[in-house]
């Protein structure tokens, strides 16, 4: 792919961006050196714990912060030094910042009447755009109400409609669901994804919630300590984490220190600390005897009766009822503790202190080198 074609298919490109507050040589570093390409029309999520730099990066795309070094390209054009009102992007904030003295329709119209970019709209065109946006978020019948008369979920829809009304090329969403209750948050995930698909606008979504990222995103960038740890589709991030941080941050996992025994094509055999054998993908550049860390998700393990052959002997240390699942902590013969999660009602239930056999699904381990 040519560089020109690549620029055209990327909505946002982050090039060697570094952000330091205060003195560039000695001040606190928010972003160390970030390179990212966000595709046109995709739902892209910046995911990470508090303080990882995800919100700082979003604010720099919006123009509320400026990079110490590097470029921010919007469809190939460097906008790193431009003020927010000169960027064809809009932001939906965690706190929706609706004007309390205006009706819902007036909130939407305000941004269209004062838009700094693009041609001015007439009153009839503004009214039609407001109707279209309220219909998009299913809020037409609330057009004359004030924000204080709406629920949190309804205010979130209005904030989204207001941000979409000027037809930005990129929409930035800064943890917009965090103030909603669980049921409403789950419903809004589906709505946001559907609206993004319908409008065709690139969405860049910031969250620390792994479930939000996994269920909504086309691709995810996982950040930690000002650096991008891994970029990929949700399934790749979860099933094939690039390093120990990603494996630990996304969902739950078991870490097992192991040694490479032998390689057989795309697979390899690894030995755990108690002599247990684990099969996992082979990694280039590793010779027999190399030390690695294996990551195995709890749902890839299964508990069987103690007299079942072929598994690893273990003892159930504890069990927790989670509704849809049962979660066990089991101890292997070498003393290591592993977490096992099984669907509730599909298998026998083990008691605390009971001997059992741990079965490991084939090719269920990920090999981590750091």
Swiss-Prot record:
InterPro entries reported in the protein's UniProt record: AAA+_ATPase, ABC_SmlMolc_Importer, ABC_transporter-like_ATP-bd, ABC_transporter-like_CS, Mo/tungstate-bd_C_term_dom, P-loop_NTPase, PotA-like, Transp-assoc_OB_typ2
Pfam families registered for this protein in UniProt: ABC_tran (PF00005), TOBE_2 (PF08402)
Domain ABC transporter: 12-250
Enzyme class per UniProt: translocase
Signal peptide location: none
SMART domains, sorted: AAA (SM00382)
Sorted UniProt keywords: ATP-binding, Cell inner membrane, Cell membrane, Membrane, Nucleotide-binding, Translocase, Transport
Catalytic activity from the UniProt record: ATP + H2O + polyamine-[polyamine-binding protein]Side 1 = ADP + phosphate + polyamineSide 2 + [polyamine-binding protein]Side 1
GO-annotated cellular components: ATP-binding cassette (ABC) transporter complex
Annotated localization: Cell inner membrane
Subunit details: The complex is composed of two ATP-binding proteins (PotA), two transmembrane proteins (PotB and PotC) and a solute-binding protein (PotD).
Family assignment from sequence similarity: Belongs to the ABC transporter superfamily. Spermidine/putrescine importer (TC 3.A.1.11.1) family.
Biological function: Part of the ABC transporter complex PotABCD involved in spermidine/putrescine import. Responsible for energy coupling to the transport system.
Name this protein carries in UniProt: Spermidine/putrescine import ATP-binding protein PotA 1
Organism field: Pseudomonas aeruginosa (strain ATCC 15692 / DSM 22644 / CIP 104116 / JCM 14847 / LMG 12228 / 1C / PRS 101 / PAO1)
Lineage: Bacteria, Pseudomonadati, Pseudomonadota, Gammaproteobacteria, Pseudomonadales
């Amino acid at each position: 792919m040519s560089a020109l074609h690549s620029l055209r298919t990327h909505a946002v490109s982050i090039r060697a961006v570094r952000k330091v507050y205060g003195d560039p040589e000695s001040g606190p570093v928010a972003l160390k050196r970030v390179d990212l390409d966000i595709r046109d029309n995709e739902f892209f999520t910046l995911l990470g714990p508090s303080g990882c730099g995800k919100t700082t990066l979003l604010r720099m795309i919006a123009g509320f912060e400026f990079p110490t070094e590097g470029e921010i390209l919007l469809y190939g054009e460097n906008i790193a030094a431009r003020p927010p009102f000169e960027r064809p992007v809009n932001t939906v904030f965690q706190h929706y910042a609706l004007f309390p003295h205006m009706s819902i329709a007036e909130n939407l119209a305000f941004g269209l009447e004062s838009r700094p970019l693009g041609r001015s709209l007439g009153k009839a065109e503004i009214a039609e755009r407001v109707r279209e946006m309220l219909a998009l978020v299913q809020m037409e019948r609330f057009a004359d109400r004030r924000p204080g008369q709406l629920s949190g979920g309804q205010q979130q829809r209005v904030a989204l409609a207001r941000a979409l009304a000027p037809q930005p090329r990129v929409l930035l969403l800064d943890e917009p669901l965090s103030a909603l209750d669980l049921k409403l948050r789950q419903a809004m995930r589906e709505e946001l994804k559907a609206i993004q698909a319908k409008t065709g606008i690139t969405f860049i979504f910031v969250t620390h919630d792994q479930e939000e990222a996994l269920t909504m995103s086309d691709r995810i960038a996982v950040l930690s300590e000002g650096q991008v740890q891994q970029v990929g589709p949700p399934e790749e991030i979860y099933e094939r984490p690039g390093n120990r941080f990603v494996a630990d941050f996304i969902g739950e996992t078991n870490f097992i220190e192991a040694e490479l025994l032998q390689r057989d094509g795309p697979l390899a055999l690894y030995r755990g600390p108690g002599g247990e054998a684990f099969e996992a993908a082979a990694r280039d550049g590793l010779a027999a005897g190399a030390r690695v860390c294996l990551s195995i998700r709890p749902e890839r393990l299964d508990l069987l009766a103690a007299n079942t052959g072929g598994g690893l002997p273990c003892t159930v240390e504890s069990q927790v009822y989670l509704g849809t699942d049962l979660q066990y902590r089991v101890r292997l013969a070498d003393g290591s503790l592993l977490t096992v999660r099984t669907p509730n009602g599909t298998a026998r239930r083990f008691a605390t202190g009971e001997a059992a056999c741990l079965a490991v699904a084939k090719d269920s381990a990920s090999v981590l080198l750091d």
